[in-house]
Amino acid sequence: MNIYSKLLQTIKTIAEQDSSVNTVTNNGRIDLDINKTDLFPIVDVFVTGATFPSDAVIRLTIELVCVDLRDTNNEVTSDKFWNQDNEVDNLGETLMVVNRIWKKLYKDFEDTNITASESPALVPIEGDGKDVYDGWSITFDVDVPSVEMSLCND
């Protein structure tokens, strides 16, 4: 298995082991349609770029998106702080999901040979229209060894 496939498989496995995640995809975007078979919360994994910082390392930029569908309560309420939906719950739960995935990659570098960068960038995301969803996008770099290259073969 090449290092790119190993990286995606590692992230997929970590996400699937999270009890809060029901579906893991590699679409490069969240394509939501509640009439499809995807169960939420969903994690989408994609590589947005790569560099070669040295002859022995490949640095890949990873973006993970975790979202859940928003449920709306139609009860009339006078509370202006809390919306009549589960947006806050979705944001809290999906934030913890992306945090757990990133922490596992960050801490288990000796086992996986994948080194996740410190201080990932996080952005809350919200979908409107037919399917309303809430969640987080996290972007971070990972360094992986360029194992297919050898200085002896140059």
Please annotate each region the language model reported.
Residues Q17, P145-M149:
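Secondary-structure boundary elements
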Residues A56-N73, Y133-S146:
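Oligomerization/assembly interface segments of phage tail-like spikes and tubes
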Residues T72-N90:
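A solvent-exposed, charged loop/short amphipathic helix patch at secondary-structure junctions
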Residues N74-S78, M149-D154:
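Short, charged, solvent-exposed linker or helix-capping segments at domain edges/interfaces
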Residues M1-V57, D108, N153-D154:
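Small/polar-rich, solvent-exposed N-terminal microdomains that initiate assembly or binding
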Residues N22-T23, L32-V43, V88-D143:
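Acidic-leaning, charged glycine-interspersed low-complexity segments
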